[in-house]
UniProtKB/Swiss-Prot annotation:
GO CC, one annotated term: extracellular region
Taxonomic superkingdom: Eukaryota
Self-association and partners: Homohexamer of two stacked trimers; disulfide-linked.
Similarity-based family: Belongs to the hemocyanin family.
Signal peptide: 1-16
Subcellular location: Secreted, Extracellular space
Record PTM text: Glycosylation at Asn-360 is required for proper folding.
GO molecular function (one): nutrient reservoir activity
Keyword entries, A-Z: Disulfide bond, Glycoprotein, Secreted, Signal, Storage protein
Protein name listed in UniProt: Arylphorin
Glycosylation (residues): 73, 212, 360
Function as written in the Swiss-Prot or TrEMBL entry: Arylphorin is a larval storage protein (LSP) which may serve as a storage protein used primarily as a source of aromatic amino acids for protein synthesis during metamorphosis. It is a constituent of the sclerotizing system of the cuticle, and serves as a carrier for ecdysteroid hormone.
């Protein structure tokens, strides 16, 4: 009887008591039958990626597809020949780990990407992908496949499944993975009482597994407070999608149209990510991101409770000695790379890589980004690979603390070896904070924006009113069926996606920002909304001179201003750089039957999760400030597809907080500062939803 009551209480909780934000209307777009057919073919190659379904169409096509016999169906025969040469010498074996940060594995993945990218038409692309799905390593295939779908014109708008649905083992800890394997091996629940105690319930036709965030076992330090943020599946998917949009080995001139601002985009992405992380540190009482030295022990350890199907992740203890004998040469390189940049700053000019760059010019921003990413646009194609060595990759290897690879195809991964897991490691933020610090040193040489440049003649922001800002935790389910292996019979009968992971994730109530503008003229304007701290970690008010780099750009849009009073009501659901949670593939198929796809997943899949817009608040309200900046709109004349939402004009990304600030110039009628507080309702810590007590929590956040 007790078992029944406990189970009933748990199911009742997860079905009715958990609070969700007000339901939103799913924004979709109509697609034609050709698109639907292509979309289904693309999705089929993502399913059960660690297994081969010999009954599926892709297997029958890929098993016997002859690339060499079809070489005329590719626009770059040299790329196909290079792939075949490498393939005949041997590619990464199936079921080995793949990481783009290992040179040999990356070279093979790039060759595979070229095979996909240079296919003349979708049919050839699909056959090439089916060949790779059958014959090549699954991790290597997925990496090249994701990028090719984004870069090819005939797959533009195709919906990509969330990476946590494809690689669940990289997004949840091993204890959850073990529960799923155990249930599968037992063909269901054997002991209901034990199942409930360990956070496993059966709801309708699927099993639900409660998944904890990491605790003091993983973070034997204060970083465990941030696990709900750094391990959020949406945030980690966001970082993965950033990379596949702009891989560091990718040449902008060859594949895209972003060469002039590529390095700037790199800086802006990491600057904004670190600022958002800093906000979370503030509200958790941690303050600034710690610094480290290549010549002293790294204070922050990390014991990731992650594993692939084949290899556990390496661990780094607290006070890890990076300056060890095996790292001497790598640290000499890292130190020299940093010093070379600092010396160039002192001279005001950078000479190298066949370029002369004057560092007191704002146009150098993109070069500086290319330098620190060490991407393909830093070097000309005539420069041999022998002269290229990536600062980022070497730094990840040193901080990851993994043993030396056994051979070219065998290595023990660290969290820093994958874009899907990097954000879990606290040293990730410390490393990129170090890189952004060098950017900020460069920006000290730039002239601050003048009062004349910031001023908007005839336009004044009279007032800004912000609704109450409220955060809370809510349960979120995602499909994790790809974790387990299916029998041939289950594959043949399209075994239902019936394994789900449930986690408490941060969210917020939608809010409005009301902006009152008085204008003497009719004009087109850009309206930007920033969020920044009100006080630093020591409780002192921040200053624009010292803290200009700590403002997070939440939204920007254009608006036609008319003479007289103008009232703009901007809802948080309209903020441009945020997206809704991805739909599971099962829901995508249902929409495809109606000739529709989710707009967010088709157009904006690389955006930040909307639920992480605000940092977790406090019971009494944590102080922040919003800044509204209105300035004249001047459209860009360049084609920047698909980045036009980020670059609506020719102003620097993050403008006007893109460089050091002269406070007197910010006292403008078109710039308005508004103090706000972020409140948190319901359970304050994610672990308060923990097993086994998570069925008795008291979250009473009302729906609006």
């Amino acid at each position: 009887m007790k078992i029944v009551l406990v189970l009933a209480g748990l199911i009742a909780l997860v079905q009715s008591s958990v609070v969700h934000p007000p339901p939103h209307v799913l924004k979709t777009k109509d697609v034609d039958t050709v698109f639907v057919e292509r979309q289904k073919k693309v999705l089929s190659l993502f399913q059960d990626v660690d297994q081969l379904n010999t009954n599926d169409e892709y297997y029958k096509i890929g098993k016997d597809y002859d690339i060499e016999a079809n070489i005329d169906n590719y626009t770059n025969k040299k790329a196909v020949e290079d792939f075949l040469k490498m393939y005949r010498c041997g590619f990464l074996p199936k079921y080995n780990e793949f990481s783009v940060f290992h040179d040999k594995l990356r070279d093979e993945a790039i060759a595979l990407f070229h095979l996909f990218y240079y296919a003349k038409d979708f049919d050839t692309f699909y056959k090439s992908a089916a060949f790779a799905r059958v014959h090549l390593n699954q991790g290597q295939f997925l990496y090249a496949y994701y990028i090719a779908i984004i870069q090819r014109k005939d797959t533009y708008g195709i919906v990509l499944p969330a990476p946590y649905e494809i690689y669940p083992e990289l997004f949840v800890n091993i204890d959850t993975t073990y529960k799923m394997f155990r249930t599968k091996m037992q063909n269901g629940l054997i002991n209901p009482e034990a199942a409930v105690e360990y956070g496993i319930v059966k709801e309708d036709n699927h099993y639900v597994y409660y998944s904890n965030y990491s605790n003091a076992i993983t973070y034997y330090n204060e970083e465990q407070r941030l696990a709900y943020f750094t391990e959020d599946i949406g945030l980690n998917a966001y970082y993965f999608f950033f990379h596949i949009h702009l891989p560091f080995w990718w040449t902008a001139e060859k594949y895209g149209n972003l060469k002039e601002r590529r390095g700037e985009m790199y800086h802006y992405f990491y600057d904004q990510l670190l600022t958002r992380y800093y906000f979370e540190r503030l509200t958790n009482g941690l303050g600034t991101i710690p610094e480290f030295s290549w010549y002293s022990p790294v204070k922050t350890g990390h014991y990731p409770l992650l594993t692939s199907y084949y290899t556990p992740f390496s661990q780094r203890p607290n006070f890890y000695n990076v300056h060890s004998e095996e790292n001497y040469e790598k640290i000499r390189f890292l130190d020299a790379y940093e010093n070379y940049f600092v010396q160039a700053l002192q001279k005001g000019v950078f000479e190298g890589f066949g370029q002369t760059i004057y560092l007191n010019d704002s146009k150098a921003n993109s070069f500086v980004g290319n330098y620190w990413q060490d991407n393909a646009d830093l070097y000309g194609e005539e420069v041999t690979k022998d002269y290229q060595r990536s600062y980022e990759i070497v730094a990840r290897q040193v901080l990851g603390a993994a043993p030396k690879p056994f051979d070219k195809y065998t290595f023990m991964p660290s969290a820093l070896d994958f874009y899907q897991t990097s954000l879990r490691d606290p040293t990730f933020y410390q490393l990129y904070n170090r890189i952004i610090g060098y950017f900020n040193q460069f920006k000290q040489y730039l002239e601050p924006h003048s009062q004349e440049k910031l001023h908007f003649v005839g336009v004044k922001v009279n007032n800004v009113v912000v609704d109450k800002l409220v955060t809370f935790f809510e349960y979120y389910d995602f499909d994790a069926t790809n974790t387990v292996f299916l029998t041939e019979e289950e594959l043949k009968t399209k075994y239902p996606h019936n394994l789900k992971v449930r986690q408490p994730r941060l969210n917020h109530q939608p809010f409005n920002i009301n902006i009152d503008i008085k204008a003497d003229v009719a004009t087109d304007a850009v309206v930007k909304i920033f969020m920044g701290p009100k006080y630093n970690e020591n409780g002192f008010p921040i200053t624009l001179e010292n803290d200009w780099m700590k403002f997070f750009e939440m939204d920007w849009f254009t608006h036609k201003i008319t003479p007289g009073q103008n009232t703009i009501v901007r809802n948080s659901n309209e903020f441009v750089i945020f997206k809704e949670d991805s739909l599971p593939s099962t829901e995508l198929y249902k929409l495809l039957e109606k000739g529709k796809v989710p707009f967010d997943m088709s157009e904006d899949f690389g955006y930040l999760p909307k639920r992480l817009m605000l940092p977790r608040g406090t019971k009494g309200g944590f102080p922040f400030q919003f800044v509204v900046f209105v300035y004249p709109f001047e459209s860009t004349t360049k084609n920047l597809t698909p980045y036009e939402k980020f670059m609506i004009d020719n102003k620097p990304l993050g403008y006007p907080f893109d460089r050091p600030v002269d406070t007197s110039c910010f006292k403008q009628p078109n710039i308005f500062f508004r103090d706000v507080s972020v409140y948190h309702e319901g359970e304050y810590h994610a672990y308060e939803y923990n097993v086994p007590a998570y069925f008795s929590h008291t979250n009473k956040v009302p729906k609006e």
